């Protein structure tokens, strides 16, 4: 069970919910990091008293240093600071809750210190899953999933001793805010429309990914890496209610699932307390009033991002890094009002067609694929 924790991305949706869990479970904080949210970071640092607070942005870090001058909190900036927070000796666990590929180097730094990784930053696994898992094995670092679907799979696999008995993993997908819409209807969807998720309140990037269904595609690749499963042994089912968080189907056709209210504090907490369970702040599920549970198939023709991600999953090598880099660039453009909703998939397809895939990539190949994909997408 975790006792002292570093959070990379503490001011975001996962970061703040992680602090709720840490406070409720009596754990302590070694380091906090964010990009530029000075005020929120100051508040968090005063409340949780970490040794180290890091802001990626230099100017924001200088401001934070002045604001925290009356405390013992050391303030750093940039990637150097992020790496120091990830490897800080007093922490046994690092929660990776930054958004995007920027999380890769700090995740590797934490792994090399043998820390438990509570992994929310799925982009890291999509880009460099094989590398990250090999390093985790070499350094004896545990990786525990924070993503609700992967936590559900993890919990549904806990009783299983022989992976050969697993027929397939089934990821549930809410369908997002645009479920049931046609391509014509999606044409004019704006930033505001995309940011209205029916079941979860999350950061802007992942909320857009949930609207395009790219999020489920990223999760598909994340599951392949975390559970060593080939793409043909993973399926996606639309489940609008987000009550069943994912399932494992075994060779005898038994299905084991994990259910819960849609509340990220539960999977965050389990990544910290595993193999124990303790009472925590997550909302209980009221089975008697949650209504019927429904299931359906995803529409891969309307939601092209999901089809592109499945293609990248089957291709392997740097295809995941290309998919992800192009998507990060395209989503940033969509959020800035520069491209339309359907153009996100166009940009990703464009990058996948243009950037060559490297088999068995090292870190340099992955970083190169990411940069080339971002350029090709713009
Ligand atoms: P948010 O956008 O809410 O938060 C992101 C955090 O990362 C903030 O602390 C932000 O700081 C920091 N950050 C952003 N960009 C950078 C950067 N370039 N360098 C350093 N720090 C940066 O995201 P979420 O919490 O929603 O998501 C975080 C990760 O967790 C993502 O990978 C997402 O896919 C995954 N995830 C999220 C879920 C959710 O429910 N939110 C569910 C499952 C997975 P600042 O505040 O200063 O911008
Ligand atoms: Mg998820």
What positions do the PLM features span?
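Catalytic, metal-anchored helix/loop core of enzyme active sites in primary metabolism
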Residues: 1-378
């Amino acid at each position: 069970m975790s006792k002292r924790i570093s959070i990379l991305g503490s001011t975001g949706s996962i970061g703040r919910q992680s602090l709720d869990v840490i406070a409720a479970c009596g754990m302590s904080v070694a380091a906090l990091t964010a990009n530029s949210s000075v005020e929120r970071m100051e508040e968090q640092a005063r409340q949780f008293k970490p040794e180290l607070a890091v802001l990626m942005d230099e100017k924001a870090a200088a401001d934070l240093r002045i604001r925290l001058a009356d405390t013992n909190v050391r303030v750093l900036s940039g990637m150097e600071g992020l790496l120091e927070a990830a490897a800080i000796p007093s922490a046994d666990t690092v929660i990776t809750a930054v958004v995007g590929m920027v999380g890769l180097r700090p995740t590797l730094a934490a792994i090399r210190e043998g820390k438990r990784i509570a992994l929310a930053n799925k982009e890291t696994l999509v880009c460099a899953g094989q590398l990250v898992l090999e390093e985790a094995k070499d350094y004896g670092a545990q990786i525990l999933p924070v993503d609700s679907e992967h936590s559900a799979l993890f919990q549904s696999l806990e009783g299983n001793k022989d992976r050969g008995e697993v027929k397939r993993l089934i990821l549930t997908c809410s369908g997002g805010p645009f479920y049931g819409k046609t391509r014509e209807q999606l044409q004019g969807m704006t930033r505001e429309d995309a940011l209205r998720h029916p079941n979860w309140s999350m950061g802007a990037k992942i909320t857009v990914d949930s609207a395009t269904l790219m999020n489920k595609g990223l999760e598909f690749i994340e599951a392949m890496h975390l559970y060593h499963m080939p793409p043909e042994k993973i399926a996606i089912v639309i489940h609008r209610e987000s009550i069943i968080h994912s399932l494992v189907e075994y060779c005898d056709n038994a299905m084991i699932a994990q259910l819960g209210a849609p509340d990220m504090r539960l999977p965050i907490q389990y990544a910290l307390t595993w193999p124990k369970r303790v009472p925590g702040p997550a909302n209980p599920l009221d089975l008697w009033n949650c209504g019927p549970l429904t299931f359906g198939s995803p529409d891969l023709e309307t939601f092209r991002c999901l089809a592109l991600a499945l293609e990248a999953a089957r291709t392997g090598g740097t295809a995941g890094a290309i998919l992800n880099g192009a998507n990060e660039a395209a989503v940033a453009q969509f959020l800035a009002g520069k491209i339309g909703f359907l153009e996100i998939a166009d940009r990703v397809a464009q990058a996948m067609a243009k950037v060559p895939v490297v088999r068995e990539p090292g870190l340099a190949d992955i970083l190169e694929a990411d940069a080339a994909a971002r350029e090709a997408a713009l």
